[in-house]
Amino acid sequence: MDKKSRVLIVGGTGYIGKRIVNASISLGHPTYVLFRPEVVSNIDKVQMLLYFKQLGAKLIEASLDDHQRLVDALKQVDVVISALAGGVLSHHILEQLKLVEAIKEAGNIKRFLPSEFGMDPDIMEHALQPGSITFIDKRKVRRAIEAASIPYTYVSSNMFAGYFAGSLAQLDGHMMPPRDKVLIYGDGNVKGIWVDEDDVGTYTIKSIDDPQTLNKTMYIRPPMNILSQKEVIQIWERLSEQNLDKIYISSQDFLADMKDKSYEEKIVRCHLYQIFFRGDLYNFEIGPNAIEATKLYPEVKYVTMDSYLERYV
């Protein structure tokens, strides 16, 4: 049996990072979790780190601003996965450029997976502002990786189920299904791709030692989870035995309503526009420099949205 790579996860206490840490440990990889010195003041993150340690992970304290300490950490591992936050309220994507410099100096890293886990930034050059900032910064990191000739895999995992399926993709900030009415974008029939976060972790770790994913983008497109917003709503209505009042909003009204929103709200709405009006998750064919995860790893029994939504009933 081939020896499994030693994996360092940066951002391992975050929303998707903790799933990647769990998957790495579960799949038998020697797992290292990098944490920033200031994390010790956050009781929730400290408890999570101690939990990872109990499972067998090794904890490494280092700041991305401490170049030498970062290089020393990298020399202990084979693969680096970054799960640094790239969301609206906490956006640290360009911090990864420090990680790229450290990987270059360390010289031993066999694979780097930067923080992506959403839409493919290289096909989002048309994205609306200010939502485009996410994709602009991710492209900068990609180009730095490639310029440094660092072996990579980019993971495009589409919509996190917890944020999108759990809320039926509503704008109200609630992460539970609505009980009376639901907002539908356009006619509600544009296809999207909804993915369980634990499955994102599993597919990500599966890819790190696979030569088929080397220097490629890996899309996670579970066939049974390629669904429109309306189809996800119908699943929820069937499970909950409750019919929701449907409120439809046109693309014109949706965009017009953005004008008076905060910067953060505009970013969220831009991304929703790309997904549910333009269909940017599924309106393209996977090219020769990319590969699809469920075809690569058919042994993974991914969570369907029917199954996922049962927890909310």
From Swiss-Prot:
Top-level taxon of origin: Eukaryota
Keyword NADP: yes
Reaction it catalyzes: (+)-lariciresinol + NADP(+) = (+)-pinoresinol + NADPH + H(+); (-)-lariciresinol + NADP(+) = (-)-pinoresinol + NADPH + H(+); (+)-secoisolariciresinol + NADP(+) = (-)-lariciresinol + NADPH + H(+)
Broad EC category: oxidoreductase
Residues binding substrate, per UniProt: 271
Chain sites annotated for binding NADP(+): 11-17, 36, 45, 142
A Pfam family matched in the record: NmrA
Coiled-coil positions: none
Gene Ontology terms, MF aspect: lariciresinol reductase activity; pinoresinol reductase activity
Stored InterPro entries: NAD(P)-bd_dom_sf (IPR036291), NmrA-like (IPR008030), NmrA-type/Isoflavone_red_sf (IPR050608), PCBER-like (IPR045312)
Entry EC number(s): 1.23.1.1, 1.23.1.4, 1.23.1.3
Alphabetically ordered keywords of this record: NADP, Oxidoreductase
Annotated catalytic residues: 138 (proton acceptor)
GO biological process, one term: (-)-lariciresinol catabolic process
Additional record remark: Phe-164, Val-268 and Leu-272 are involved in enantiospecific binding of (-)-pinoresinol while in PLR_Tp2, a 'Gly-268' and a symmetric substitution between Phe and Leu favor binding of the (+)-antipode of pinoresinol.
Function: Reductase involved in lignan biosynthesis. Catalyzes the enantioselective sequential conversion of (-)-pinoresinol into (-)-lariciresinol and of (-)-lariciresinol into (+)-secoisolariciresinol. Can also convert with a lower efficiency (+)-pinoresinol into (+)-lariciresinol, but not (+)-lariciresinol into (-)-secoisolariciresinol. Abstracts the 4R-hydride from the NADPH cofactor during catalysis.
Family: Belongs to the NmrA-type oxidoreductase family. Isoflavone reductase subfamily.
Subunit description: Dimer.
Protein name listed in UniProt: Bifunctional pinoresinol-lariciresinol reductase 1
